[in-house]
Amino acid sequence: MRFFNMSRNNKNVIIDGHRMSCNGIKGSGITKTITVNPEPFSRVNLIGSIDVDITISDTPLIQVTADDNLVDLIEVSFFGDSVDIGFKENASFNTNKPMLVKISCPILSRIALSGSGDVTASNLNQENFEASIAGSGDITLDGSAKNIAFSINGSGDIDATHLKAENLEVTIAGSGDVDATATVSAHVRVSGSGNVKV
């Protein structure tokens, strides 16, 4: 059963498997996938430990996979041109199967990762692209973009060795690393033990 709670300005999609207490739920080991058909978006915000796989495609689509009794704990919310992915408030659980969100969208201008989840984005083709990490999660990118800006506050890493770019700007506060390419210019600011390889 799926519950859709949508207002005019804040469209919340609560993907619901079983309605139960959120305290210490153990994953069933049975995988379930829910499909969400969203409005167009270009920004992805991830909060928590969910892994996200993003592919550039003409048709926007979101698929959420998890233990069938934990899918209800994952929230997908739309705010303008952004989609937020995270957990319901006070959720407490132990997974048996991996939690994975697959996203297709025609344009991706920004990824913001807060937490320990990992994000992969493939086939980027942008004029401007931004990615930020607050936490220990990693971001892996490929494709092309004229101007890219990366920021890390924590221990997460950004691997953009397969993202062709002209101009690069990197800001690191912490121990995170960035591997990237830039054919025209690179501006780097590091506060902490993080490393940048261009």
What function would you assign to each model-found segment?
Residues 1-198:
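Intrinsically disordered, low-complexity terminal regions
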